[in-house]
């Protein structure tokens, strides 16, 4: 499945991290699997949705909001400009077990 709608874009930031970015036309989910020991097929971008979708099941990753606000290392994210959108209708971020 391709990432996002035509008005969205994806950016591969490192071999283990792909960010599906947001713009003013569409909201895209974000999945950062760099801290999980998963195979390459899990590194595909997530697709557009009202809320960031979970990582691939049955091996979920740590939710992005937890990764970006934790002390865990996130390689390749130092030079990325991230725009955060809060969506009250979304479920609260609860860290998953990797």
From Swiss-Prot:
It comes from the Eukaryota. It comes from Bos taurus (Bovine). InterPro entries: Keratin_matx (IPR007659). The modification N-acetylalanine is found at residue 2. GO terms for cellular component: cytosol; keratin filament. This is Keratin-associated protein 3-3. PANTHER family: KERATIN ASSOCIATED PROTEIN 3-3-RELATED, KERATIN-ASSOCIATED PROTEIN 3-3. Keywords: Acetylation, Keratin, Repeat. Residues 3-59 are annotated as: 3 X 5 AA repeats of C-C-X(3). In the hair cortex, hair keratin intermediate filaments are embedded in an interfilamentous matrix, consisting of hair keratin-associated proteins (KRTAP), which are essential for the formation of a rigid and resistant hair shaft through their extensive disulfide bond cross-linking with abundant cysteine residues of hair keratins. The matrix proteins include the high-sulfur and high-glycine-tyrosine keratins. One of its GO terms (molecular function) is structural molecule activity. Interacts with hair keratins. The keyword Transport does not apply. Belongs to the KRTAP type 3 family. Pfam families: Keratin_matx. Sequence repeats lie at residues 3-7, 8-12, 47-51.
């Amino acid at each position: 499945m391709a990432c996002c709608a035509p008005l969205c874009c994806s950016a591969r930031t490192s071999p283990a991290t792909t960010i599906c970015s947001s713009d003013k036309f569409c909201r895209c989910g974000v999945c950062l699997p760099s801290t999980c020991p998963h195979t390459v097929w899990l590194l595909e971008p997530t697709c557009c949705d009202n809320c960031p979708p979970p990582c691939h099941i049955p091996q979920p990753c740590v939710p992005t909001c937890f990764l970006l606000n934790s002390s865990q290392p996130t390689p390749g994210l130092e030079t990325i400009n991230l725009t955060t959108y809060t969506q009250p209708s979304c479920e609260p971020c609860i860290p998953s077990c990797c």
